[in-house]
Amino acid sequence: MPQAPKPTPELDDATLAFAERVFDSARSGDSARLGELLAQGMPANLRNHAGDSLLMLASYHGHREAARTVLGYGADPQLRNHRGHTPLAGAAFKGDLAMIELLLEHGVDVEGRCEDGKTALMMAAMFNRTEIVAYLIARGADPRATDAGGATPLAAAIMMGALDTQAQLRRIVG
């Protein structure tokens, strides 16, 4: 018999406003503010209404120092948001190689998958990110992996019309 969901505590307006300022700190890259709050006991894996963690917001918006700060306080680098996306997939989508390097340095699985089975390599291929495709493959990403629908990185590049990564992946997989 399925268990009933746990009740969600009601939060007052002041608490909700404070939480939004915390998420804004991650979005804007305010690593000093994040560090202060984390040092006071704020959970490193705090998530907003969309399931975006502090790390997801910092990494998606390209704030490496803020991401490094949150990771230093134990943030889970593979925590998915409610859409099933990971920080690594977000960085691949945005084309942020330095963020990808940081996440991999902190133990992110290069083959980690989003809820739909897409890997960061597939995201990079879809959006014509040749430098990131090369880097991820060099770090062990499988260019023949398939997502939940059976699409490979090459198929994803074809579907999105990403000509450079199509050519790159054709050279790699034959």
PLM region spans:
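Ankyrin-repeat-protein effector appendages
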Residues: M1-V22, H106, A138-R139, A148-A151, ...
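Alpha-helical segment of the N-proximal tetratricopeptide repeat
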Residues: A17-A39
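Conserved ankyrin/ankyrin-like repeat signature
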Residues: R33, E65-A66, A98-M99, E131-I132, ...
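Alpha-helical adaptor scaffolds
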Residues: Y60, H82-E105, E111
